[in-house]
Amino acid sequence: MEKEKLTNRTSTHKFNETDRETNHSRRHRHHHSRHRESKHGRHDRSERPSSREAGDRSRHERFSKEPLEVKKLPVENEYFDSKFASASSMPSSKDNPQNNDFTNSLQGLDFGTFGSRIQREPIDRKSNKPGEIFVGATLQNESSTSTEHKDIEQLETEINESGINYKIGDNGSRWRMMKLKRVFDMAQDQRRPVEEVALERYGSLKEFDFALEERDELELRKRTRKVQKEVPTGELYEKRCADEFKTRKDSGNGATYYKVIPDPSVNKDTPTESDLNRLKADLLRAQLKKDPNYESLEREYQKACDDFENSLHPSENSNSQATIPSKKRNFDDPTIDEMVQEEKLLNKQRKYGQNYEYAKQIAKDKTYSNNLDYLDENAGKLSNRMKRGDVSLAQISSGGDLKKINHVLDTCPLCLNYETQPLAPVISLSHRAYVSLPTQPELAKYHCLIVPTGHRINTLSCDEDEWDEIRNFMKCIALMFDSMNLGVIFYENAPSPQRYMHTAIECIPVSKRILSLAPAYFREALSTSDEEWSQHRKIIDTLEGSKKYGKWAFRKMMVKELGYFHVWFSIDGGYGHVVEDEKAWGRHDQVPRQVFASMLNLPPEVIRRKGSWTGKKDPREDMFRSRFEKFDWTKGLID
């Protein structure tokens, strides 16, 4: 027994040693094989047996005298070559007849594709065809259906190839909205169709519809604070084309509607809706540009309309013209709305015109007599009243509300005429302008105003005589403050011409040091007052322009039709700014008063002016009049 145990231990020991040597040699061969692979590449790896197969072969050689031949079958997938046994190791169907059904079901299958990702079939988005189109009872072909399908496909292609390189709400969005607003304003002023003006400004209605879509999205974001889309999708342009197609289709014979019956005798050269739209756009461009080929394009368009109409109505005469509605407005044949608007304007002019004002003035005057002496003696009263009538007519022609304008004129605290005195105090008076004092709180001691006697919305609307008298007052006030060793800054704030408020020039005394720093303060304030993208220059340097235009720099470089702000650092010029957004600019001189508050270290309550003129005597009048008396140029008029 002991000998048998010893023999078993010896054999076991030898077997373990043999196993360790085999494992060592295997690791050694594996190390060299990795070295060869890294040196020579891995292109021949599939030709060598794997490490698992080599280990299995060594075990069979140790425990079996007869070597086991392993035949490698060609398998397309390396993954299954290393994970699954070869076909020779599997039991045949003869040995196990129960697997016949299983093996028969696996015939013809490619196991190399098992476990791979399922490829999704591409989706044809153009297969989402629109609903069935119904046309008139006289239609006996499918030309309209194929036409609409072609139009929709072409429309999608145009929208996809539109090349939109911006996003809704980006830095250029404000500029695009201003361009869109100018299109509507121009169409209203010139009484032209919006589409015609848009085609002239944008070049195509597609770009115009993109701008409309962006405007709707911005308004939706303001209301809901949600982003629906980043870029225009072309929905409005698609709807426009569909509406135009429907309008032209409905303008036919008005028969009952049923489904289209296919007709093999359709002419493939028949123009489509998109062809008509393209020809119409070319015709309109040629008309706007006065192209000499306009007549040929018109004939081509008319022929295309005839062909298209004949394709829709094959039973009718082929020479009949197609009745396609046009959006061009004919001024020789005005609409009912235009005639009503014109009649209202004429009634206003007849009611509130010069004859009405003249008759009203005569009725109030008990001393009236129809002779030249009376006209000479009362020429001043009649002329002042006629000026006011001219102002009202100008506002009527520009679309203003006459009732609102008359209310502003009747309640204006700065107008000075023979009938009413201004509520503001009058320090010095000339023929066309006067010096007054502002409401409380004032920006500085001896703060004063230069006001035209007539109701002017800005000083640019004043004539040359009025402007000369205003400049005379500016010179006198500058001399008065210079005698006090002070500088002066003049500014005019007229941001809203449509409100028709009486303008005035503010005169604020400052120290000489602050006067030298004032241009930097106002440059910074005007640069940040509006949005980054604006149509006009942020700052119009009239001080630099005075070197070329002299005292007329302000009147030549600014425009009276636009709301503006202007500050004078000298008598001849300073900085001008066109106010594009009245709400952002604010009311009651908010921007300039903020600048003066920062320069002069004023409290916050001074920024907003809350006072008003009462018509009572102001205690500041005597103090200012005593200072200004020696510099008053109107004394020469009295003498």
Curated annotation (Swiss-Prot):
Bias-annotated ranges (Polar residues): 95-105, 312-324
Which keywords belong to this entry?
Answer: mRNA processing, mRNA splicing, Nucleus, Spliceosome
- Cellular component terms per the entry's GO annotation: post-mRNA release spliceosomal complex; Prp19 complex; spliceosomal complex; U2-type spliceosomal complex
**Principal cellular location given in the protein's record:** nucleus
Q: Which domain of life is it from?
A: Eukaryota
Q: Where is this region: Disordered?
A: 1-75, 86-105, 309-332
The GO annotation for biological process reads: mRNA cis splicing, via spliceosome; mRNA splicing, via spliceosome
Locations of Basic and acidic residues compositional bias? 14-24, 44-75
Q: Which regions are flagged for Basic residues bias?
A: 25-43
Q: Which residues form a coiled coil?
A: none
Q: Name one Pfam family in it.
A: CwfJ_C_1
User: Carries keyword DNA damage?
Assistant: no
Location of this chain's protein in the cell: Nucleus
Q: Which family does it belong to?
A: Belongs to the CWF19 family.
**Subunit details:** Belongs to the 40S cdc5-associated complex (or cwf complex), a spliceosome sub-complex reminiscent of a late-stage spliceosome composed of the U2, U5 and U6 snRNAs and at least brr2, cdc5, cwf2/prp3, cwf3/syf1, cwf4/syf3, cwf5/ecm2, spp42/cwf6, cwf7/spf27, cwf8, cwf9, cwf10, cwf11, cwf12, prp45/cwf13, cwf14, cwf15, cwf16, cwf17, cwf18, cwf19, cwf20, cwf21, cwf22, cwf23, cwf24, cwf25, cwf26, cyp7/cwf27, cwf28, cwf29/ist3, lea1, msl1, prp5/cwf1, prp10, prp12/sap130, prp17, prp22, sap61, sap62, sap114, sap145, slu7, smb1, smd1, smd3, smf1, smg1 and syf2.
Summary of the function given for this chain in its UniProt record: Involved in mRNA splicing where it associates with cdc5 and the other cwf proteins as part of the spliceosome. Involved in mRNA splicing.
Q: What is this protein called?
A: Pre-mRNA-splicing factor cwf19
The scientific name of the source species is Schizosaccharomyces pombe (strain 972 / ATCC 24843) (Fission yeast)
Gene encoding this polypeptide? cwf19
